């Protein structure tokens, strides 16, 4: 976008303004704040700006008030110091003045958005001279307002926010300062196996946490009591362990854990060595010795990639492991990139978000990029850029 003349052009910008809401009020405006520089740049260049976004998961093709972007339009108006009208039937066409921005109502209210309907994508493309894809968080979805319109617009380009996200991730994965340490938490090996396998070729150390660690511990012959575990993935975990050893990747498992008989606010939490977990106990966090080991690895790291908490941080008694890890990452001189909804919620809880080098709000796209997948919207933008260069 920064290479184009936007003056007097109809510029359609796809942002990710999918902010959390409670009772019609925005509870976290991080995604809106991140989108502002791109929108401001277009307004300053006297473009005729149309902003697109989705919000939540409404029934496609149907207006549902709770998923309306009205609260977002109000906040944008405040942040941009100009009235940003919310336009409902924008597909019929809308007149925008140079230097003005409008917000188009939730793209998911349009039938055909999710399955990337060609007619819908072409209609969106007709409404603009330039399409700017700035929403990395939706780049992994081939939908009408992302990859679809990018294919048919007269001119399609990447926005500054999308570029910054791709550059941050590429810096961590393609040309990292060594040693590269990855932390992969979460409850299931099955949802993170592609990520783990892709990271294995890149990292020096790989820390697994949460339910994923339980599956690895059980595969190594430890008793994990009633802990969350995927028994059908024990063989895969064992094979992965062997592969890591072959590639000289260190996979430090917990040496001590925090256990309880049940998961509740008033559960009696006890620190146990990993070989002392009884059959009626469940593991809900890592213990202090494990945290100390992880902190040492963070201090020595050149680059840190973190996705997923390593304990049930929402409950105070089981939050120490994730808290200690977040503090160690914050303290480290390493370049740190952190993503995933639960991880961001943990950082928020511990007031450490701004101590990370780069925080990705992208969720699924962050994960798929780390898995080594080519994201549909980025693929089409790359193709369009090549076409443009050849002209």
UniProtKB/Swiss-Prot annotation:
GO biological process: gluconeogenesis; glycolytic process
Signal sequence bounds: none
Protein localization: Cytoplasm
Transmembrane segments: none
Known EC number: 2.7.2.3
Binding positions for substrate per the UniProt entry: 16-18, 31, 54-57, 108, 141
Keywords: ATP-binding, Cytoplasm, Glycolysis, Kinase, Nucleotide-binding, Transferase
Residues that bind ATP: 192, 314, 340-343
InterPro entries linked to this entry: Phosphoglycerate_kinase, Phosphoglycerate_kinase_CS, Phosphoglycerate_kinase_N, Phosphoglycerate_kinase_sf
Catalyzed chemical reaction(s): (2R)-3-phosphoglycerate + ATP = (2R)-3-phospho-glyceroyl phosphate + ADP
UniProt GO MF annotations: ADP binding; ATP binding; phosphoglycerate kinase activity
Pathway: Carbohydrate degradation; glycolysis; pyruvate from D-glyceraldehyde 3-phosphate: step 2/5
PROSITE patterns in UniProt: PGLYCERATE_KINASE (PS00111)
GO cellular component terms, semicolon-separated: cytosol
Predominant cellular place of this UniProt entry's protein: cytoplasm
Family designation: Belongs to the phosphoglycerate kinase family.
Subunit structure comment from the entry: Monomer.
Record-given protein name: Phosphoglycerate kinase
Designated gene of the protein: pgk
């Amino acid at each position: 976008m920064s290479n184009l003349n936007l003056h007097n052009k109809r510029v359609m910008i796809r942002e990710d303004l999918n902010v959390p809401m409670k009772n019609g009020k925005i509870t976290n405006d991080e995604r809106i704040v991140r989108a502002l520089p791109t929108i401001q740049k277009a307004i300053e260049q006297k473009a005729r700006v149309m902003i697109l976004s989705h919000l939540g998961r409404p029934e496609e093709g149907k207006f549902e008030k709770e998923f309306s972007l009205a609260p977002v339009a109000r906040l944008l108006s405040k942040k941009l110091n100009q009235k940003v009208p919310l336009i409902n039937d924008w597909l019929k066409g809308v007149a925008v003045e140079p230097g003005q921005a409008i917000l188009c109502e939730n793209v998911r209210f349009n039938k055909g958005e999710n399955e990337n309907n060609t007619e819908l994508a072409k209609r969106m493309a007709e409404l603009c001279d330039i399409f700017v894809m700035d929403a990395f968080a939706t780049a992994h979805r081939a939908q009408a307002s992302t990859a679809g319109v990018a294919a048919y617009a007269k001119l399609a380009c990447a926005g500054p926010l999308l570029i910054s996200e791709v550059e941050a991730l590429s810096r961590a994965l393609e040309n990292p300062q060594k040693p590269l340490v990855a932390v992969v938490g979460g409850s299931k090996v099955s949802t993170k196996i592609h990520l783990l396998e892709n990271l294995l070729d890149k990292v020096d150390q790989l820390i697994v946490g949460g339910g994923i660690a339980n599956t690895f511990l059980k595969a190594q012959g430890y008793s994990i009591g009633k802990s969350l575990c995927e028994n059908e993935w024990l063989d895969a975990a064992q094979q992965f362990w062997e592969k890591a050893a072959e590639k000289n990747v260190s996979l430090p498992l917990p040496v001590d854990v925090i256990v309880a008989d049940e998961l509740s606010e008033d559960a009696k939490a006890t620190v146990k060595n990993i070989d002392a977990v009884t059959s009626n106990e469940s593991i809900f966090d890592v213990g202090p010795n494990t945290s100390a080991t992880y902190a040492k690895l963070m201090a020595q790291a050149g680059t840190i990639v973190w996705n997923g908490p390593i304990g049930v941080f929402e409950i105070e008694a089981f939050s120490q492991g994730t808290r200690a890890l977040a503090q160690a990452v914050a303290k480290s001189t390493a370049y740190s990139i952190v993503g995933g909804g639960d991880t961001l919620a943990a950082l928020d809880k511990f007031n450490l978000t701004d101590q990370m080098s780069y925080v990705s709000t992208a969720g699924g796209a962050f994960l798929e990029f780390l898995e080594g997948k080519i994201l549909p919207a980025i693929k089409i933008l790359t193709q369009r850029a090549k076409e443009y260069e050849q002209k």
